[in-house]
């Protein structure tokens, strides 16, 4: 009798232990899974590099939004290597990723983005490209693909208009050698990148349109021998170091004392603008009262750029809303999870068709 009771007690203990273990396992699986039309698993977010200041801001915003929502995610740093990023995508898919959020490295051709779509579509996983340009034909090739970015041409237009109006406020003061024209240098972030191409072109064209409407001549690139009329980051990293090196070389030959000083600096992004400011300050410019200040303009409105605008060493920037970009990505992920059209709930003014979101720009001069 006692032996039978003992056996029953042992059985019940084992039963309850097994039940508890199963319930715990189910709880863990549900807590760790983001879930989506692409299957159970984490959201995999791929950045072209962690070292880009603007992208770091997007990453911080997206990490917080996903964490606050209780979604499981993993961030990948490609360190500017498309080969690395493609391998990371393959690994994430093999691990059962629920969605791929991709800041693609190679924007010079469609091959990289199309390859990622091919990998994702084979496993029915949604893809959200963001920030770095992907062609419309690539996006349209997969019905579970969305691009979150900007109307990339608009940044150049807005920057050019801002620069033109800024120069007109005190044109003679910015014309340091009194020749009636403003000389400039343009720092381009990357060859073959649609955003860099548009910013480089339209910043100058729209600035000239503003000046010429006011009866002023077009701005002139400081080096007549440079047919491109820009200096590009040869590594394609839009980096402050590239701009600092270029600007330091320029300042070794051009100065107010020589009467040939570069009178305006235009950069494709704030990192390059800040690099130019660093070189200028090392040469004694843009240091506040008592020093000559060269107007410097960027794009992104990073915290570092805002600080330089506040102290007067930088003139203005175009805000690219990283937090707004992160929120749009989260909304699209939710829509895929709920099997809704991906752009549901996003302001129609910021959408193009059914597969693109343009986060709006705004001018920032510290006012």
Model-derived regions, located:
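Short, low-complexity disordered leader/linker segments with a strong preference
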Residues: 1-42, 67-68, 72, 115-125, ...
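Hydrophobic alpha-helical segments within soluble ligand-binding/sensing domains
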Residues: 40, 85, 146-181, 198, ...
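Short beta-strand->loop
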Residues: 47, 148-150, 182-195, 233-236
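Extracytoplasmic "Venus flytrap"
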Residues: 42-61, 65-66, 73-90, 97, ...
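Flexible loop/hinge segments that line or gate small-molecule binding clefts
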Residues: 116-154, 158, 172-181, 187, ...
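Hinge/cleft segment of the Venus flytrap/periplasmic-binding protein
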Residues: 178-183, 187-191, 195, 207, ...
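Hydrophobic alpha-helical
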Residues: 102-122, 203, 227-306
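Short, solvent-exposed amphipathic alpha-helices that sit
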Residues: 54-69, 155-159, 194-221, 225, ...
